[in-house]
From Swiss-Prot:
Residues 28-59 have a biased composition (Acidic residues). Expressed in brain, spleen, and lung. Not detected in pancreas or liver. In pancreas, expressed predominantly in islet cells and to a lesser extent in acinar cells, but not expressed in ductal cells. Up-regulated in various pancreatic ductal adenocarcinomas and pancreatic intraepithelial neoplasias. Detected in pancreatic ductal adenocarcinoma cells (at protein level). Not detected in non-neoplastic ductal epithelium (at protein level). It comes from Homo sapiens. The keyword Membrane does not apply. This is S100P-binding protein. Residues 188-234 have a biased composition (Polar residues). Its main location: nucleus.
Amino acid sequence: MMCSRVPSEQSSGTSLLPKDGAPFSWDSLDEDGLDDSLLELSEGEEDDGDVNYTEEEIDALLKEDDPSYEQSSGEDDGGHVEKGERGSQILLDTPREKNSSYSLGPVAETPDLFKLPQLSTSSGHGPAHTKPLNRRSVLEKNLIKVTVAPFNPTVCDALLDKDETDSSKDTEKLSSLGEEMREDGLSPNESKLCTESEGISPNNSAWNGPQLSSSNNNFQQTVSDKNMPDSENPTSVFSRISDHSETPNMELSCRNGGSHKSSCEMRSLVVSTSSNKQDVLNKDSGKMKGHERRLGKVIPVLQTKTRTNVPTFSQSNLEQQKQLYLRSVIAHIEDPEDTNQGISGELCALMDQVHHMQHSKWQHPSDLTTRNYARRQKHLQRYSLTQWVDRNMRSHHRFQRLPDFSYS
């Protein structure tokens, strides 16, 4: 790779030129402001190599590496531009070199940090040879290198070969899967839909291939699209990316063990039904209107609870208990056993006697919760007292004694 090299003298020489365009000379500078110690090598620039180069040798090496540098140095030798003013020139890339090289301008520096060129100020008439410098330190100090990744056709060939092998493997998988579908009795459309949902088409072979880096995948897909003609490229990159984004879950569900074919068929049917739900053009507004499902008002349904633990009694059983109770009361009246127990005590003793006469499963006479009907299952309607009387007056004779109120 060829890189544009801009010496550090550009920034220093440009900053030292007068603004009014007057000719520049080194004699105009104040010699008291120049420091010869800057020309000496610092600790990091000490010569640590086996070969030392002078400034002329460095210029010759730079001319061999960069033709533009040779052109600029040739103009300097012709006398058009002085060697001290070489820092004010800006190297521009030719149109031929724009594709492979980049040129960077002078490095922005503050006025306090300008570096003086490698010149001697003893005579003040021109530059003199200084101490030989190490080439590596000079290049690191004065040059700005830009590296660009080269285009290697062998890498593209290797990726294309790998893509072809993957596509051949996927084609074999497709043929074997098609035979299995025929054996199971699936129609060709269903098997095709299943394979498309799995992403086992030759165009989507990169999806099932080995996991490469994202840059390699994008590069491989771009190269394969460029090499394939328009007539042989059925789907675009965008459609393939959308298919990949929609079908990874279906791939996993279809690939996992168990009911492989049934789950794959179900997933393919879901994909076909979802793809059929396309936007419908509204004739009135002229806008795209999708399928919308409106839910009506949800009315909660009261769940009726059946009471299975409510004991019900037969009419004969209740009649038997009543007759037993009456006989016990009559016998107690005719022949009382204990007359000093009082009225309440006598009643309690009588009820206990009736309760324990037959068996203890009978309900105690003092318990008034005995019912011979099941509890209502439907919701009871609320009535006012007047409405209830109007509904039940004819069936209950006790309300006949109530006088009729006449409102005048």
